[in-house]
């Protein structure tokens, strides 16, 4: 069976989902008929994801899924070095995917808004304005690589799609993200 390899922060890892099968990565792979190799790591930043692909290069895959940056902006706030590290990390990860499977599509999921960034110090420096800035960088960098598409979670509603912790998606949020990823992947795979 062909596989999808996913990388990123706790949302990719499945935090907030009621079960492993209800997380965005599992739902996306299932919807596309792909076997899942989920390498998401809760609490990771983009630099952590970049370090992971440097230490253990990605395997070949029919599709790569990436969602990263939320912890960078929550911890780094509007620090210029934080967004620069995010940019460099995206280049590292996307280049690693291209080396592993040059023709395989990559779906990078844009980060949706949260309700409250003031909780969970020291990860309390973010804002939805920074989400917009990081998503802008994601779109700009993705456009520099062949077969990389950005999935935009249409219909995202932070009021109903975040878990009680206000940081992670609940099952409805995971379904929304998976739907966006599946739509982007289906278009990219044609």
Task: List where the protein language model places each region.
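Conserved SGNH/GDSL esterase-like catalytic core that processes O-acyl groups on lipids
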Residues: 2-6, 11-92, 129
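A short helix->loop->beta-strand "cap" motif at the edges of active sites that frequently abuts
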Residues: 99-106
